Amino acid sequence: AVVHAETSTGVCNPVEKIGRLVKDNSALYLVDCVTSLGGMAVNMDDWQIDALYSGTQKCLSCPPGLAPVSFSDKAVEKLTNRKTKVPNWYLDLSMITQYWSGKARVYHHTAPINMLYGLYQACYNIFEEGLESVIERHLTLHQKLVNELNGIGLELFVEKNARLPMLNAVEIPEGANDGDVRSRLLNEFHIE
């Protein structure tokens, strides 16, 4: 398992390279795309990802509350051929796969319909702009911010080749109080 876009550090992990290492292994490759989905390229099939999950509250620009997931055929096969009972009924993904398979459905949970409408609209907005355009917008705005930060003497915490385009970790200069910096950003500029 690996986190694609690490929010605590601003690092983009090399998910594609890790996928090439894992592909000839019987292990399943799980990737957390909570921060990256909708903000940068995520190529599940090309990167050999078996299970991917995200959240709606980050780059999908949707209220929190849903966790979009996707599984490779290999992962679904593992789920359906499981020999041991899942100890928690609510977390039994084999029941959820029945929603996708066309088999007789087993009631598993009450879907949050209002959240699904919100996710539908968020995805519509992304596709209306174009996913490539959305990704390019994140890159363009990231570079503008980096240029301005560098122009006033600030540096980013992460090396250029491992930076996230949608989350910028900035080094606080020597002698500056990080609490004061964050308070001023929030109170004067509405930046968290």
Predicted features, each with a name:
Residues Q57-N147, G151:
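Active-site C-terminal subdomain of aminotransferase-like
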Residues A1-S36, A51:
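Active-site phosphate-binding strand-loop segment of PLP-dependent enzymes
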